[in-house]
Amino acid sequence: MSRDTTTPDDAAAFEAAATTSGTATSAGENIPGDLLPLCREHICPVCPEKAQADEQRLRALADLENTKKRLQREKDEQVRYAAETVLADLLPTLDNLDLALQYGQGSAECRNMLVGVEMTRKLLLEALGRHGLEAVGEAGEPFTPELHEAMSHEDRGDMPADHVATVMMKGYRLKERLLRPAKVTVSRTPG
């Protein structure tokens, strides 16, 4: 529902503009392009419907821009961490290679096999590292709950309290996202 907000002076100006151009018009049809903005400016300078429509248009444009930005952020996040599930599935393989190296150290018969296992582990870590995977959790570093999962405490006089005493299972991080915390024992002062 539109209201007629024209005054007699506005109507006269519109009629004069239409007569001057030699074109009779109804509701702004057939007005030359240079007269149309002038007519709109004088007939409805503060039309509430136009102001409301302009506000709705600006809000819709702002919503569109925000949606575009959000979708781009989500896409970037997906691309950045696309390999997360595959890399997480490979972590038990790395654990088994570490266990094979750990338990085969004492056997002379396994020496040649251990060289092959060590080379395989190194190649796998290098390949995964190119995709952003890195190991976390080293003995002697300060215990950090964001990176380490404390499995037990260990009385240690040779290191400060609340440091990683033993790494039971390495943790891994993909770029800034932790895939698995390192399972560690935490030192405490004997007493």
Swiss-Prot record:
GO terms for molecular function: adenyl-nucleotide exchange factor activity; protein homodimerization activity; protein-folding chaperone binding; unfolded protein binding. HAMAP family: GrpE (MF_01151). Its main location: cytoplasm. CDD domains: GrpE (cd00446). Participates actively in the response to hyperosmotic and heat shock by preventing the aggregation of stress-denatured proteins, in association with DnaK and GrpE. It is the nucleotide exchange factor for DnaK and may function as a thermosensor. Unfolded proteins bind initially to DnaJ; upon interaction with the DnaJ-bound protein, DnaK hydrolyzes its bound ATP, resulting in the formation of a stable complex. GrpE releases ADP from DnaK; ATP binding to DnaK triggers the release of the substrate protein, thus completing the reaction cycle. Keywords: Chaperone, Cytoplasm, Stress response. It is found in: Cytoplasm. Belongs to the GrpE family. The gene is grpE. Homodimer. Transmembrane segments: none annotated. Pfam families: GrpE. GO terms for cellular component: cytoplasm. GO terms for biological process: protein folding. This is Protein GrpE. InterPro entries: GrpE (IPR000740), GrpE_coiled_coil (IPR013805), GrpE_head (IPR009012).
